[in-house]
Amino acid sequence: MFLKFCLWTMFFFSAWSPIGHAKYSSLLEVVTPLRVTVTRGNNISPGWLSYSLNIGGQRHIITMKPKKNLISRNFLLFTYSDQGDLLEQHHFVQNDCYYHGYVDEDLESPVIVNTCFGSLQGTLEINGTSYEIMPKSSTSTFEHLVYKMDSGDSESSPMRCGLSEEETAQQTKLQESNAPTLLQIPYENWWTHHRFIEYFVVLDHKQYVHRNNNITTCIQDMLQIVNGVNGYYLQIDTDVVLTTLEVWNEKNYINVELSIFKVLGDFCTWKQNMFGNRIRHDIIHLLVRQGYGLYLGLAYLADVCTPYNCGVSSVLSDVMSDMAHIVAHEMGHNFGMKHDGIGCTCGLKDCLMAPYKTNSPKFSNCSYEEMYSVVTKRSCLYDIPEALVTNLTVCGNKVVEEGEQCDCGNSESCLQDPCCSSDCVLKPGAQCAFGLCCKNCQFLKAGTVCRKEKNECDLPEWCNGTSAECPGDVYKADGIPCSGEGYCYKMECHQRDEQCRKIFGNGSRSADEICYMEMNRQGDRFGNCGNDSSTYRTCQIADVLCGQIQCENVIQLPQRRNHETVHYTHFSNITCWTMDYHFGITIDDIGAVSDGTAYAPDHICVDRKCVSKSVLVSNCSPQLYHMQGICNNKQHCHCGVTWKPPDCQKRGHGGSIDSGPPPLPLSHSKWIVYILIVLDVCIVIIIYLFSFYKLSK
């Protein structure tokens, strides 16, 4: 019990108020970055980029160079098979499109952007004000949107650590006495040593689903986050290198819906049981798409390079700069940085390690001093991640690794396995050991459905007959009509009637338009078009059907969660029912009209606004598939049952280049049966006639 108590006291409650969760106070303007030539003296600096931007009526030049050491050369990606087997990959990742720089030759004004998709996306700071830049959709002139990032009154609800200074000192003493890797560095030289953080990240299942079940998108997200984190850690001469990423693509392997304090402990225990010291890492973080009330993150204090080098971050925002700030703050705790208090300064109003969420990019003098007390005693921080090695490839650990066909575990388990032998190769006659297209150690025949469509906006996938893996999950492209007047959006056919039924049960339906007009123009918790963390936004008339869902014909109130409140109001003999949404709640607002819900002909709701369906940019058009199919979410043609991909121009059996080959149409099978029957009849007749001829002769 004492040991358990000690372990629990070895963390720092890095709890933040969600006040200041990254948002945009207003659209500053539309800008068109102009590429300019960079010179240093008389020579053009290789790899550097410069763009001219006109922001707020002033011309600024941002100068950037590629960020090196963003991802290790031997980057490891872990995913899971549908049967729960851990799969290891050495994944190639594009990492030459991430940049760091500055504005107008001011080295104190950071620029953190990426150009991976041919445009600028990231953050920059001008005269102490932070801005987010992102590409404008549907533009052919390289237009970008520039927003001012506003954190509001971030001190209005500060959350601070509950540990006393004496308890913190005891923890630090205990950590140092148990530290396995110590390296004393003379004080005068410590800052000249460049440090590397080998960063291991785990993404939970909700985040994977939120990113459309796309592993590549998850990797791209993490690179943007790590690029942002590196922008903060440049000032302390530290490279944060993404060495390992695990995606819980099948399910969560711990319960992330408990308190954040329990989740942190469970995650660290899971990490030690799952990997131990087999995967080298200095810090490991779990990023979850889960709200924890007022808390955005939690991490153990000063435990970098120890078995308790863990942290948890709630990533409910899709703004990568916001997520990077949360991760950087939690990583600071792993480095030994406490929350800033009186006397801590960085030249700005707030610093990065403030107890509440800010947009500050700078560490305080206190953070520097606290970090020094840790980094001088951690030799692991001076290892170069490019030399990363892993000894995880061990036959018999039930993990299918590179070079293995299967892994059935110990000898006893392998005796019961019909497909896999104890030396991690397939048994004679076996084609496979796992996978949605594997049955009885054999590949399922081509055309066997391995993933049925979940709903009318989904698409099926079929086995190809030569692989145990089912093709990746694809679905109908956003904007395709569904259920009469609806449109498919992110694999769902969003409709107000259906949303009302999900909230209030069968029989309920979307209310009369007067409910939307009266309620959503009030701008309160029961009727609004979103909020700015301090005030609710009143819906414009054109957007009222995209605000809070308003329902009628509610027969029986279903049991809701504790933080949810049902509200009803009468207008013109109509009872309008809706759900409220409180400030400080970090889960999705279930009472908001779902993105993708149809508004009017060729219009949908997106982010509480009525927008043209044309915002759903697609490179796939009816002309591309010759009017004989539909587009999928990868912008490829999914052909009808009698047409052949990729362009549905020739006769075939349907499907797409992403779905696998569909089965032979039943009509074709019937024709084959008919032909065989006719042939059999003909053979019988010929034999009969031949026999009759011989007898008559």
Curated annotation (Swiss-Prot):
<feature type="domain" description="Disintegrin">
    <location>
        <begin position="392"/>
        <end position="478"/>
    </location>
</feature>
<keyword id="KW-0472">Membrane</keyword>
<feature type="domain" description="Peptidase M12B">
    <location>
        <begin position="195"/>
        <end position="385"/>
    </location>
</feature>
<feature type="propeptide">
    <location>
        <begin position="23"/>
        <end position="187"/>
    </location>
</feature>
<keyword id="KW-0482">Metalloprotease</keyword>
<feature type="binding site">
    <location>
        <position position="329"/>
    </location>
    <ligand>
        <name>Zn(2+)</name>
    </ligand>
</feature>
<feature type="signal peptide">
    <location>
        <begin position="1"/>
        <end position="22"/>
    </location>
</feature>
<keyword id="KW-0645">Protease</keyword>
<feature type="disulfide bond">
    <location>
        <begin position="344"/>
        <end position="366"/>
    </location>
</feature>
<feature type="transmembrane region" description="Helical">
    <location>
        <begin position="672"/>
        <end position="692"/>
    </location>
</feature>
<dbReference type="GO" id="GO:0007283">
    <property type="term" value="P:spermatogenesis"/>
</dbReference>
<feature type="glycosylation site" description="N-linked (GlcNAc...) asparagine">
    <location>
        <position position="365"/>
    </location>
</feature>
<dbReference type="GO" id="GO:0008237">
    <property type="term" value="F:metallopeptidase activity"/>
</dbReference>
<keyword id="KW-0732">Signal</keyword>
<dbReference type="InterPro" id="IPR002870">
    <property type="entry name" value="Peptidase_M12B_N"/>
</dbReference>
<feature type="glycosylation site" description="N-linked (GlcNAc...) asparagine">
    <location>
        <position position="391"/>
    </location>
</feature>
<keyword id="KW-0325">Glycoprotein</keyword>
<dbReference type="InterPro" id="IPR034027">
    <property type="entry name" value="Reprolysin_adamalysin"/>
</dbReference>
<feature type="glycosylation site" description="N-linked (GlcNAc...) asparagine">
    <location>
        <position position="573"/>
    </location>
</feature>
<dbReference type="InterPro" id="IPR036436">
    <property type="entry name" value="Disintegrin_dom_sf"/>
</dbReference>
<feature type="topological domain" description="Cytoplasmic">
    <location>
        <begin position="693"/>
        <end position="697"/>
    </location>
</feature>
<dbReference type="GO" id="GO:0046872">
    <property type="term" value="F:metal ion binding"/>
</dbReference>
<dbReference type="GO" id="GO:0006508">
    <property type="term" value="P:proteolysis"/>
</dbReference>
<dbReference type="Pfam" id="PF01421">
    <property type="entry name" value="Reprolysin"/>
</dbReference>
<feature type="disulfide bond">
    <location>
        <begin position="450"/>
        <end position="470"/>
    </location>
</feature>
<feature type="disulfide bond">
    <location>
        <begin position="639"/>
        <end position="648"/>
    </location>
</feature>
<dbReference type="InterPro" id="IPR006586">
    <property type="entry name" value="ADAM_Cys-rich"/>
</dbReference>
<feature type="binding site">
    <location>
        <position position="333"/>
    </location>
    <ligand>
        <name>Zn(2+)</name>
    </ligand>
</feature>
<feature type="domain" description="EGF-like">
    <location>
        <begin position="616"/>
        <end position="649"/>
    </location>
</feature>
<dbReference type="GO" id="GO:1990913">
    <property type="term" value="C:sperm head plasma membrane"/>
</dbReference>
<keyword id="KW-1133">Transmembrane helix</keyword>
<feature type="topological domain" description="Extracellular">
    <location>
        <begin position="188"/>
        <end position="671"/>
    </location>
</feature>
<feature type="active site">
    <location>
        <position position="330"/>
    </location>
</feature>
<protein>
    <recommendedName>
        <fullName>Disintegrin and metalloproteinase domain-containing protein 26A</fullName>
        <ecNumber>3.4.24.-</ecNumber>
    </recommendedName>
</protein>
<feature type="disulfide bond">
    <location>
        <begin position="620"/>
        <end position="631"/>
    </location>
</feature>
<keyword id="KW-0862">Zinc</keyword>
<dbReference type="Pfam" id="PF08516">
    <property type="entry name" value="ADAM_CR"/>
</dbReference>
<dbReference type="InterPro" id="IPR024079">
    <property type="entry name" value="MetalloPept_cat_dom_sf"/>
</dbReference>
<dbReference type="GO" id="GO:0005178">
    <property type="term" value="F:integrin binding"/>
</dbReference>
<keyword id="KW-0221">Differentiation</keyword>
<keyword id="KW-0865">Zymogen</keyword>
<keyword id="KW-1015">Disulfide bond</keyword>
